[in-house]
């Protein structure tokens, strides 16, 4: 699961949308309805990043910020820092 999420993120960072679509679909298929909060929220963030990369900036930014907030609510400061840094690196103000 984590490997699929990392591959999805890498594809999005390099605007490789064809490959990103593959990893998005694969992750959708293997993520179950169990309580995998980290994985589900990381996927939520990356889907927002995909929207942003594809030009839907407002919706994408909103979804990425939601995911960062969820990591904060879950008490995961390392993930907050990681995704906030990613957000600031890729989102043009």
Task: For each feature predicted by the language model, list its residue ranges.
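"A position-specific structural signal for the A-helix of alpha-solenoid helical repeats
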Residues: 2-10, 39-46, 53, 79, ...
């Amino acid at each position: 699961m984590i490997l699929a999420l990392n591959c999805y993120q890498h594809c999005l960072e390099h605007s490789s949308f064809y490959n990103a679509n593959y990893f998005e679909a694969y992750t959708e298929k293997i993520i179950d309805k169990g309580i995998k909060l980290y994985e589900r929220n990381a996927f939520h963030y990356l889907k927002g990043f995909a929207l942003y990369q594809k030009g839907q900036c407002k919706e994408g930014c909103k979804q990425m910020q939601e995911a960062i907030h969820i990591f904060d609510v879950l008490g995961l400061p390392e993930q907050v820092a990681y995704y906030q840094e990613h957000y600031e690196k890729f989102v043009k103000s």
